Amino acid sequence: MARRTEQRRAAVWALYQSDLLGRPLGDTLPRDVHMFTLALAEQAREHQPELDELIRRHAKDWPLERIAPLERSILRVALLEMLHPDVVPGDQPIPPEGAIDEAIETAKRFCGSGAPAFINGILGAVLQERTGAGP
C-alpha cells in the first residue's frame, strides 16, 4: 500500500493532468487507484469552486489563471484536507498544519523555488482566517 504522502501526490498529479490536458479526471487516474487518492481527487474537483475562491482571495495580486497549474492542484488538495476532512476516507484526518507541511514538501520537490513560500502563505492565511491560528 502506498504511503499517504504518495497518495496525496497522485491526487495532485491527476488534478494537474486533468486541468492541463482538459481531460476528465477519471482519464488521468490509473485503474488500480487507491481509494484515498480517488476520494481526494474527486472531492477536490467537487469542491473546486469553493477552494478556488479561497485561493483567489488569499493570492493577492495573483489571478488564479497566473498560478502554475501544479501549484493550483497542490493548493486544492491541501485546502480540501484542511477544510473538509470528513470527505476523505480514513480513521484519522490529517491536521491542518500537517496538510500545509505536505503541500510545502510537494512544492519543494516538484515546483519552482518560490512555490513553497507562496503555497505556505496562502494556506497559512486560510488557516489563520478559519481558526485564528497560523502554521
Give residue spans per PLM region.
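N-terminal interaction/assembly modules
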Residues: 1-135
